[in-house]
From Swiss-Prot:
It is an enzyme of class 7 (translocase). Mg(2+) 2 binds at N216, D219, D434. The record marks R178, D223, D230, D680, K691 as: Important for ion transport. The chain crosses the membrane at residues 1-21, 62-82, 83-103, 128-148, 164-184, 231-251, 261-281, 298-318, 328-348, 376-398, 412-432, 465-485, 516-536, 585-605, 616-636, 685-705. This is K(+)-insensitive pyrophosphate-energized proton pump. It is found in: Cell inner membrane. One of its GO terms (molecular function) is magnesium ion binding. Its cofactor is Mg(2+). The lineage of its organism: Bacteria, Pseudomonadati, Pseudomonadota, Alphaproteobacteria, Hyphomicrobiales. It comes from Bradyrhizobium diazoefficiens (strain JCM 10833 / BCRC 13528 / IAM 13628 / NBRC 14792 / USDA 110).
Length: 706
């Protein structure tokens, strides 16, 4: 009981930190009336979009809530609601701070680079701490309520199902937020660039471009609210999956409760280390912004190592554990592996997307010979970028499995995600600096201010790319833990078919000789591609609508280009809001319905009865692995490739290969418009898709067992 209260205290601390940081950000100077006017337009657009998005999700959520009450009971449905509401809240609050911090960052940059950095990072840290804190509070308090208030056994089905449903609630918000936000932001970005930069020849964030405000709104709904929901979900889902595994592996042992609280305790201690880490972010004498941010991340990592050692030692000791053949020490070693995997994935992603390294420079060089060669080189880099992260994840799985079996992999993933607070802070720093640059440009601030905001924005682009790499790596491992939970859960029901009569005579066979397993693998493998295609098509459609709208305004109001007429910014925002909401629903339902359809389809094809059930459970399990395997590669290649295309354009804009306006620059803009939906819509949305498929399969087991 004390352990749970201490974990809750850590969660509360993160919320207190967020409140303190918010008041500190809001007390900063908000700049000139012109700057405030632009910021207000961005804020209104972002709030209007989120209201629509949450209303739509709310309708879908209520339907699922009712179904869960019917199939699995009230407490499971409440778990779903908690996950959904908290995930939505983290994104909503974070974004509301971010749209107020942008103008203050632009104003702070007029005095010093350090001031701009401090404000933008603090705004990002608010979202980060809310994500980690609310996810931890949601899981811990509901688990505590079920176990201590309702007096349910920690490994009872109600508790396990309610925890899985909580993860499902977070997942649902996450896939909608990622996809909807991504369609909005990239529709504006691609559409605005095609007409503004390529046709009209005006620079980025030029106030004459009617899509400018929509582009700045998009940064917030995509990168701030979208990323927050994504990592909230991975955090909650991994904690839940680790708890489910603990409930199965340590069912009849005295350490059951300690093992189930272990992932939560690791999360709790890492919130404290993340909060301490934020105070290390200071601009040093070298004036390296990335260096300042990495100082905070490294401090968090080192402190977390010590914290995790303390947590494991106090909860379960370093010695031999009941019921299994590994020690507490080997679980700590798995935690260390989790931190090493995090560091390596971040470093590899930066290598593939940073302007200082070979991949980005090679795309920039290829732009000299034209649009085609830019796209060819960009695609080559996007494929190459999958190799090293995959090898790191493979090594992580092998080492942790040999140390402590499946539970070791789960603890490594839980440790990886325990740093989510700091990582989301780095990510949410991106849209704040991006918007600050836009506001500085539109308000006509002096050149040296633009220089500061550009420097911050360039780093913001790298942090956004780096955190996407982390989000995918952790999602892949998290999904693997969920697959293990599916497999163990299935074994549990089959072994206990006296109580769960549906599973009588079922004998799932995951060997590769089973044709149903091969069918499942292939079916799972196609899902990320199909899902990615839907996302890309949606962006293409939204961008076309924006291109038409911007051209129409330029045609009907020739005064816009002379600066005598004002563009109608609201029209573009409204158009994108409608498009994004409409386009996000069908793709989001794909991973929700797939496991159910595959199960009943294979059940019917294999002739029903116990044989049909065995075939269907095997096919669904294989499908989950198929989704993880191709999903990982699709997501990494899209996010890293897109990031490299984007930064190749920035590299040329910095004066290489002829600089802005050169032929190489025009080719690089083409590459960037391809890379945009790659890295900000389809790629990141594959993350929640992988996990939803796995969670729905777990819930399907629970429903069939009832």
């Amino acid at each position: 009981m004390t352990a749970l209260w201490l974990i809750v205290l850590c969660g509360v601390l993160s919320v207190v930190y967020a409140i303190w940081a918010t008041s500190s950000v809001l007390s900063a100077d908000a700049g000139s009336p012109r700057m405030q006017e632009i910021a207000a337009a961005v804020r209104e657009g972002a709030q209007a979009y989120l209201r629509r998005q949450y209303t739509t999700i709310g309708i879908v959520g209520i339907v699922i809530f009712v179904l869960l009450v019917y199939f699995l009971g009230f407490y499971v449905a409440i778990g779903f609601a908690i996950g959904a509401i908290l995930s939505g809240a983290a994104g909503f609050i974070g974004m509301n701070v971010s749209v107020r911090a942008n103008v203050r960052t632009a104003q702070a940059a007029t005095t010093s680079l350090a001031g701009g950095l401090e404000l933008a990072f603090k705004a990002g840290a608010i979202t980060g701490m809310l994500v980690a804190g609310l996810a931890l509070l949601g899981v811990t308090l509901y688990f505590g309520f079920l176990v201590y208030s309702l007096k349910l056994a920690p490994d009872s089905r109600v508790v396990v199902d309610a925890m899985v449903a909580l993860g499902f609630g977070a997942s649902l918000i996450s896939i909608f937020a990622r996809l909807g936000g991504g369609i909005f932001t990239k529709g504006a970005d691609v559409g605005g660039d095609l007409v503004g930069k390529v046709e009209a020849g005006i620079p980025e964030d030029d106030p004459r471009n009617p899509a400018t405000i929509a582009d700045n709104v998009g940064d917030n709904v995509g990168d701030c609210a979208g990323m927050a929901a994504d990592l909230f979900e991975t955090y909650a889902v991994t904690a839940v999956a680790t708890m489910v595994l603990a409930a199965i592996f340590f069912a009849k042992t005295p350490i059951l409760m300690s093992m189930m609280t272990l992932p939560l305790a690791i999360g709790g201690i890492c919130i404290i280390t993340s909060i301490i880490g934020t105070f290390f972010v200071k601009l040093g004498p070298s004036q390296s912004i990335m260096g300042a941010l990495y100082k905070g991340l490294i401090a968090t990592g080192v402190l977390s190592l010590i914290g995790i050692a303390v947590v494991i030692y106090t909860l379960i000791g370093f010695g031999k554990l009941d019921g299994v053949d590994y020690t507490g020490m080997s679980l700590f070693e798995c935690g260390v592996v989790g931190l090493i995997v995090t560091a390596l994935i971040i470093w590899i992603t930066e290598y593939y997307t940073g302007t200082d390294y070979r991949p980005v420079k090679s795309i920039a060089a290829a732009s000299v010979t034209g649009h085609g060669t830019n796209v060819i080189q960009g695609l080559a880099i996007s494929m190459e970028a999958t190799a090293l992260p995959a090898i790191v994840i493979i090594a992580g799985i092998l080492v942790t499995y040999s140390l402590a079996g499946l539970f070791g992999i789960a603890i490594a993933t839980a440790t990886m995600l325990a740093l989510a607070g700091m990582i989301v802070a780095l990510d949410a720093f991106g849209p704040v600096t991006d918007n600050a640059g836009g506001i500085a440009e539109m308000a006509g601030l002096p050149k040296e201010v633009r220089k500061s905001t550009d420097a911050l924005d360039a780093v913001g682009n790298t942090t956004k790319a780096v955190t996407k790499g982390y989000a995918i790596g952790s999602a892949g491992l998290g999904a693997l833990v969920l697959f293990a939970a599916y497999n163990q859960d299935l074994k549990f029901f089959v072994a206990d078919s006296a109580h769960h009569t549906y599973f009588a005579g079922v004998n799932p066979d995951f060997s590769l000789n089973n044709p149903y397993v091969v069918v499942g693998l292939l079916f799972g493998g196609l899902l990320p591609y199909l899902f990615g295609a839907m996302g890309m098509t949606a962006v293409g459609r939204a961008a076309s609508a924006i291109v038409e709208e911007v051209r129409r305004q330029f045609r009907e109001k020739p005064g816009i280009m002379q600066g005598t007429d004002k563009p109608d910014y609201g029209k573009a925002v409204d158009l994108l809001t409608k498009a994004a909401i409409k386009e996000m629903i069908i793709p989001s339902l794909l991973p929700v319905l797939s496991p159910i359809v595959v199960y009943f389809l294979i059940y019917a094809i294999a002739g029903g009865g116990a044989t049909g059930k065995s075939a269907a459970f095997s096919a669904v399990g294989a499908m989950l692995l198929g989704v993880i395997v191709t999903g990982l590669f699709v997501a990494i290649s899209m996010t890293s490739g897109g990031g490299a295309w984007d930064n190749a354009k920035k590299y040329i804009e910095d004066g290489h290969y002829g600089g802005k306006g050169s032929d190489a620059h025009k080719s690089a803009v083409t590459g960037d418009t391809v890379g945009d939906p790659y890295k900000d819509t389809a790629g990141p949305a594959v993350n929640p898709m992988i996990k939803i498929t796995n969670i729905v399969a777990l819930l399907l087991l629970a429903i069939l067992a009832h």
